[in-house]
Swiss-Prot record:
It comes from Pan troglodytes (Chimpanzee). This is Patr class I histocompatibility antigen, alpha chain G. PROSITE patterns: IG_LIKE (PS50835), IG_MHC (PS00290). Glycans are attached at N110. Residues 25-114 are annotated as: Alpha-1. GO terms for cellular component: external side of plasma membrane; extracellular space; MHC class I protein complex. It is a single-pass type I membrane protein. Residues 25-308 are extracellular. Residues 333-338 are cytoplasmic. PANTHER family: HLA CLASS I HISTOCOMPATIBILITY ANTIGEN, ALPHA CHAIN G, MHC CLASS I-RELATED.
Length: 338
């Protein structure tokens, strides 16, 4: 069996756990984790990661030489040794719980011990511009499919199938929703406020995108216009194409926002246009760091306007690095297991 690399785990997480988009001016804290069984190769691997907005700040990997919760942002490094000891202790407890849960779920689904399986988890809270809780959420996924989710009222659960109904009944018997609600309405909000204050220079900044439009001939009769937005933060951005002032939806390709590896993000939107009609098309960019929305056209020149290979290669590689994997047990101790 091939052992999964962290990048693969991130892709699994992004595919199964749906992230709620934060509103403009809002902030979020999210923890993700993934436990992957590997029969014949020891205990399941457990990876965990925490994010404030679009910035990773903690990381844990059970396969490291000395597994500990580690800082990934300068503003969290100032926390004392007691903080990191508790983070590590709680994360290891969460990892052990998920290893047991993997065995339990394999039994629920009557699956072979020889096959590998994945349990994913996400919890988080969003704050509005007034600093109050907008929403809280917790989700579980098994083998890349929805399993169990805390409802928006933070008082009840939604089970995806018959097996998940068993876990739902266990959560209800243990008053798990009440525990989660206390964390999401209290501890999560308090720590998010603390992190936003300690890391305000990084977390509350708004870096505007660097934008340009490139031209790529496809056939003699049509071409692709690609609108680029590079180096922006936070990640939320809107790119649209218009033809003669009307929004275009057909023949438009829009990629997901991707991390650039330096704390900023990248995105592009492309549209296929008839050759000779390029100037009828405009790209419109909206981002928090811009004083007003931008409107761009392709500027024809004697040189080809293809993006440099470094940018293209970087985007391809970075497409696999998505917000993914960490642990809410960092801030609350998981008291029930499937």
């Amino acid at each position: 069996m091939v052992v999964m690399a962290p990048r693969t785990l991130f892709l699994l997480l992004s595919g199964a756990l749906t992230l709620t988009e934060t509103w403009a001016g809002s902030h979020s804290m999210r923890y993700f984790s993934a436990a992957v069984s590997r029969p014949g190769r020891g205990e399941p691997r457990f990876i965990a990661m925490g994010y404030v907005d679009d910035t990773q700040f903690v990381w844990f990997d059970s396969d490291s030489a000395c597994p500990r919760m580690e800082p990934r942002a300068p503003w969290v490094e100032q926390e004392g040794p007691e903080y990191w000891e508790e983070e590590t202790r709680n994360t290891k407890a969460h990892a052990q719980t998920d290893r047991i849960n993997l065995q339990t779920l394999r039994g629920y689904y009557n699956q072979s011990e020889a096959s590998s399986h994945t349990l994913q988890w996400m919890i988080g809270c969003d704050l509005g511009s007034d600093g109050r809780l907008l929403r809280g959420y917790e989700q579980y996924a098994y083998d890349g499919k929805d399993y169990l989710a805390l409802n928006e009222d933070l008082r009840s659960w939604t089970a995806a199938d018959t097996a998940a109904q068993i876990s739902k009944r266990k959560c209800e018997a243990a008053n798990a929703a009440e525990q989660r609600r206390a964390y999401l309405e209290g501890t999560c909000v308090e720590w998010l406020h603390r992190y936003l204050e300690n890391g305000k220079e990084m977390l509350q900044r708004a870096d505007p995108p660097k934008t340009h439009v490139t031209h790529h001939p496809v056939f003699d009769y049509e071409a692709t216009l690609r609108c680029w937005a590079l180096g922006f933060y936070p990640a939320e951005i809107i790119l649209t194409w218009q033809r003669d002032g009307e929004d275009q939806t057909q023949d438009v390709e829009l990629v997901e926002t991707r991390p650039a590896g330096d704390g900023t993000f990248q995105k592009w939107a492309a549209v296929v246009v008839p050759s000779g009609e390029e100037q009828r098309y405009t790209c419109h960019v909206q981002h928090e760091g811009l004083p007003e929305p931008l409107m761009l056209r392709w500027k024809q020149s004697s040189l080809p306007t293809i993006p440099i290979m470094g940018i293209v290669a970087g985007l391809v590689v970075l497409a696999a690095v998505v917000t993914g994997a960490a642990v809410a047990a960092v801030l609350w101790r998981k008291k029930s297991s499937d």
